[in-house]
Amino acid sequence: MRRIGFYLFIMAVFLLAPLLALPQKAVPAPAAVPTPTPTAVARAAAPYRAVWVSYLEWEQVDFSSAEAFTQAIGTMLDNIQSIGATVVLAQVRPFGDALYPSGYFPFSHLCTGTQGQDPGFDPLALLVDAAHARDLQLEAWVNPYRIQAGQTPALCGASPARLHPDWVRYTDTGAYLDPANADVRQYIADGVGELCARYAVDGIHFDDYFYPTTDPAFDAADYAASGTALARDDWR
């Protein structure tokens, strides 16, 4: 019996040997877990809380020198920052004039009391720098059409109203560039282009302006020449 058992064992070894010699199926290694790429944490946009600085406020600011102006706007901007505002909408073109040296508009009378008179420094450049130093955005506020409110200001020879009298229309409230005039619209656009090219302003703000009047006589010739099928109010 022992001999029979021995022979059975030998036969089993010979039968299993080919199977053991077969190549083993490769077991795939577990896939590497990719390391996540760090991503920048999105910063919430600062809330848009704006303060207007109009020509009425500029009348209270000292433009007598760059130093006096810098001190005055520093106090003003500190106050604006203290109330949680993030944006300053500074009126820089109030009456077809400018609070900066321009190839299109004379210096504002707000700078010296006389339109066209150079204050000896660039108020807007100082204002932009002072605002940005306080992490405030500075948008340049433009009144595109108004030249005078009543008789204010007294116009200098470099005013668009003096250089291009055919661009101007008059009402009982003052003098305005004619919105219907294509040359006027281009002039306004060129003035905005100058602002954007020369100053690091954070936006252009059109405000404090309206179509000068509802009187049909104001732009009757322009309306007739346009050949439009639109009603006058829609055309305006």
Residue locations for each model-derived region?
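Catalytic domains of carbohydrate-active enzymes, especially glycoside hydrolases
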Residues: 71-98, 198-203
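Aromatic- and glycine-enriched glycan-recognition loops and surfaces
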Residues: 65-83, 110-134, 235-236
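Sec-dependent N-terminal signal peptides of Gram-positive bacterial secreted proteins and lipoproteins
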Residues: 5-23
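Structural recognition of the beta-strand scaffold that forms the well-ordered cores
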Residues: 49-53, 87-91, 137-141, 203-207
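Ser/Thr-rich, Proline-interspersed low-complexity disordered segments
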Residues: 18-44
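Active-site-adjacent "subsite" loops/lids of carbohydrate-active enzymes
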Residues: 43-71, 128-129, 139-198
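Aromatic- and acidic-residue-enriched segments that line the glycan-binding/catalytic groove
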Residues: 100-113, 146-172, 209-230
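Aromatic-lined carbohydrate-binding/catalytic grooves of carbohydrate-active enzymes
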Residues: 83-119
